[in-house]
Each structure stands twice: as C-alpha cells, then as structure tokens.
C-alpha cells in the first residue's frame, strides 16, 4: 500500500546499530513506569506463581513499563502507542504509581533528536489510558494533540466501544486522551486488518477489549509483532496467564494461541509494551509448550 500522506525529508537520527526491518529503523521508547495490581494482571493464576517473576509491592502492585515503539524510515517518524502521559491528578498518580523520574515520552524522543512536530503518524493499539494517555497534552489549560502534525490511527469499532464502555472497563477510558484527536481533525479510522503504511499492517484482536489493533512490521524476512495487551509482559507467554482486565478471556486464550503458534513457526520478534525488563524477544516450542527464547535488543 502506498503512503496516504506525502513524505518529509528528515536527517538520519543516532543509532547505526539499531535493528532495521525493511526501510524502518526501530527504537524502543520508554515513556515512564507505573504499577497495577498483580492479581488483576494475572487473573486466575495464584499469587505464589506470579510473584516469582513479578514481585509485588506492599499494595500488591507490580512494576510495569509503558513502552512505545518508534519507526523511522520512508521519510516518516511513526510512533506506536504513547504511554500514560502526564495529565493525571495526585489521586490517580498515587493509585497507579506513575513515575517519569527516569524517562518520559518526550525526553526519550528528544534523546533521538526528535521533536513533537517531527512525528508523522501515531498508531494507537487501543484507547486505554496507559496506551493513549500520551497522545494528548495540556497546553495553557487546553488539551491538545501531543504531536500536532501527526495522523492518529484508531480502529473504528474500538472508537465506538470507547464511547459506550461497560461498567467493567469504563475506568480505563479517559476522553481527554482521545477526543482532541477528533476535534483537531488528526484522527483517522482503521477498519479491521489492513495495511496502514508500507510494511506496517495491523491484526485485530477482541479478547482484551473490542477491536484492539496489533501492528505488524515486516519486510518478508523479519517480522515484529507489537503485542500490546494481548501479551503485555513476557510472563503472559504462558497460555492461561491472562489478565482479569480482559473483557473476553476465553477469546484472549485462542488469540494468544494463534499468535504464539505463528510467532514460533515464523520466528517473529514479539514486542512487550509492559514488561519492565524485556522489550522484545522471540519464543520457541518445548515439551512444556511455547516459552520465551532469546531477548532481542531494540
């Protein structure tokens, strides 16, 4: 598919040793840390099992990354997800332990000599606050898109779901994170599985939330699958380790099975948005099932 928008000529950014897939150089972007309840993150899995790999704090919360992915190439700067952002009040900060002491989205981009105006495209996997919070910022008391020249891509069915949430998932959606994208005419809807930009397509899953889109970056030889909340952490590679947050956990189970089978057979790289220690890895099949294999540096 041809690019929907004209290319811009940008100079190369640091990172000669960074991974490349097709025309794109890939950079894992740390946007900050936060914490969620360990029981909610692992559903029916007993605490004595999950606390071995994800030790909780005194409030039973486990450490979480909010990791985005930057693609640079074809005259574009493409960001996948945007982390929590920085618009939250003291109450939410205390609940979720938001921490940008060591990194935030804009400092991480600045370290690569990228300004907000340089971002051409933002693919939002879904609109939960820990993925879309950084899509907007507060500027002189007004909430505006964080990247003023970017197109923001959201699945249309997910947009509808975010505007009609259930009591179960209502707390995950904050309109300030996404309504300005429409107001400022920077929003573009995707519809199912399609190619968004050259070498970048999306797969749609429905277990965690309705119409979550997982970007797939491929050049026919190397493929990276952006897991989002289908596989938020490396611990979730184990099939029954499924979040209690998921609206349809049995759907998640089958979606995980399908993706992990493909990732094993085709040696995909899996990108983990929330794992505090591992940004990306491959998986392999063993007698005990599919397990984590070698980490991949991004």
Give the role of each language-model region.
Residues 20-111, 214-229:
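Conserved beta-strand hairpin/beta-sheet module of binuclear metal-dependent hydrolase folds
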Residues 96-107, 218-298:
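Cap/insert and terminal regions of metallo-dependent hydrolase folds
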Residues 100-114, 118-130, 146-204, 209, ...:
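Metallo-beta-lactamase
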